[in-house]
Amino acid sequence: GQTRLGRAGKPFRLYKFRTMRIEECDESGLNQSVGNGARQTRVGRLLRATSLDELPQLWNIIIGDMSVVGPRPMVEGQQAAGRDYREVVPYYDFRQLMPPGLSGWAQANGLRGSTQEYGPAKRRIDHDCAYIQNFSLALDLKIIVRTFIKEFLTGSGV
């Protein structure tokens, strides 16, 4: 697992299946995997393409570190366009008012994966903030359905 930021910025251990070659693994989580990079194992590519590498996060939900829906947990010092998210998006910490989720509004709208540019990073945070401002059971159900279709049925995992 990797250390991620939870509610109120509290660090927690995020559980995932290993999809990278051990010798090329980045335990910090700052070096994001891009596409089908050479660091991924053959099985790892399949797990990531179907998002099955996320299944161990059900344990994070059971022990209270995460919820089913909420902003996806990020690594401390996560970067976008070579700069810390907090520099790129000044209201970044607003997303930590809720526990992180297995899926979120940004992910359900296709905003996931590596963020090498400012625009996608800001859109991701904007979606997280919109989720918090419009939190409801109906929105959670919409996110769960969209995530299931996008990640598991169409295999759009990154």
Q: PLM features: residue spans?
A:
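Conserved small/aromatic sequence motifs within transmembrane helices
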Residues: 1-158
